[in-house]
Amino acid sequence: MSSQSPSISSEEFAERRRCAAEMAGADGLKGLLICSRGGGTLDRFGDVFYLTNYYTSFPYIPDLAGAWSARAHTFLVLSAKGDCVLVTDAPNDNHTALAEEDVIYTDLVLDGVLEAMRRLGMETGKVGLVGGDVMPVNTYQALDGLLPEVVWPNAQHILVNLRAVKSPDEIALLRRASVVGAQAIEAMMAAAEPGSSHGDVVAAGMAVLAPAGASLYNSFMASGRGGENPQVVRRNFPTWGSKEPLADGQWFRIGLSGVVDGYYFDLSRSKAIGPPTNQQIELFEAAIEIVEAAIAEIRPGVTAETVAQAGLAKQTALGYPNDGVFSGLGHGVGLGWDAPWLAVGDQTVIESGMVLCIERTIRKNGYLGDFEETVVVTEDGCEKITGAQIRYW
């Protein structure tokens, strides 16, 4: 693989903004106000980043009247004519895909939004709101007070639809992220040996991620024993926080996700600590079978629900209840968790160029199996891009 990272061109960012503006106009909107969160979080930065290549690094702090407002949040004001202004609370790092005159840098982010809305003639009428789910209520109330003649219909669907199908350069970035994620999880699985703590395992992964310029998003980690006296060892915060050393006879799983150049990797693996037992292998293999059954259904024209039902049918046939923490079989992936959701009820039609994560965690009698892969949807099926070792038994 080339040492040079793939990237998105300024022309592609401009085309994304053009499409978003056109969709806003088609919905009868004057434009869009797009809000994203930064400040070290990795779960809802994608909408503004998708359109501008900008991420704010400043952490969240409560508003202080006259001094600062809406810190850790970035806003893009985009008119239906295609003009835009980015309002940021951290300096441009020379990667932003906008001209300098189209960026307002200020501690008083809400005042900057007001200035941008007036500059683009959007201080009255219907302006679609994107990212309302990450905007604090007090921020929305303040905006509503500053712009009393604006109506804010939900326009999240515009960015959901744009981000669902990836461009060739996005797919290249997701391939690179998957390579880094695969290398990290293989290092972690190798470190998962008797005597190691969950933290030791994460340290092995970070030794791969940090030099690659990657950020760890989640490392959902658990170990335990099945049988008459089942035991599960895990922590909610951090998700790898257990200090209890791994021991022979335990099962072990990692659900690992992270970000490379803005794009996510997401994968899961399981193994036995010490020699595997038949019961452990049964769960590990069942998780793989369920995921593979869902992957076999992926091709353009089928629905997300159809893919989910294929995996769930295999799970039922194997005798495992659907009682995990996530009832779906997976999701799109890009600058976050994207559409579609591989779940019953999602009628989204699968298209070539989507990138999907397919996942399953199953439990029985105290044993656990966990497996997740990432695929690119092709013209006639899909291609796996995860690349990590699958079986450790």
Language-model segment annotations:
Residues M1-W393:
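Active-site neighborhoods and metal-handling regions in enzymes and metal-associated proteins
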